């Protein structure tokens, strides 16, 4: 993958949505919810503030995260789907 995010942007590999419900019902492709979890694969240098100082990113490559439902822009690279989003769209790190 050759995506290098700029500023406070982060590249996330989308984790697949569940194929079955908890009760075992197999979901058709159209019924699946858009996933909101992913793995950070690349991080920009951070946000530059008006005074010129820089805020370092709070996540790093390899972190599993939860992000806002409609966050980011989808891109496809080498057959893999990724999201590019701002750090503010990440809600939590899964530990």
UniProtKB/Swiss-Prot annotation:
Residues 36-55 are annotated as: Disordered. It comes from the Bacteria. It is found in: Cytoplasm. The keyword Cell inner membrane does not apply. One of its GO terms (cellular component) is cytoplasm. Its main location: cytoplasm. One of its GO terms (biological process) is chaperone cofactor-dependent protein refolding. One of its GO terms (molecular function) is ATP binding. Pfam families: Cpn10 (PF00166). Keywords: Chaperone, Cytoplasm. HAMAP family: CH10. Together with the chaperonin GroEL, plays an essential role in assisting protein folding. The GroEL-GroES system forms a nano-cage that allows encapsulation of the non-native substrate proteins and provides a physical environment optimized to promote and accelerate protein folding. GroES binds to the apical surface of the GroEL ring, thereby capping the opening of the GroEL channel. Heptamer of 7 subunits arranged in a ring. Interacts with the chaperonin GroEL. Belongs to the GroES chaperonin family. PANTHER family: 10 KDA HEAT SHOCK PROTEIN, CO-CHAPERONIN GROES. This is Co-chaperonin GroES. It comes from Natranaerobius thermophilus (strain ATCC BAA-1301 / DSM 18059 / JW/NM-WN-LF).
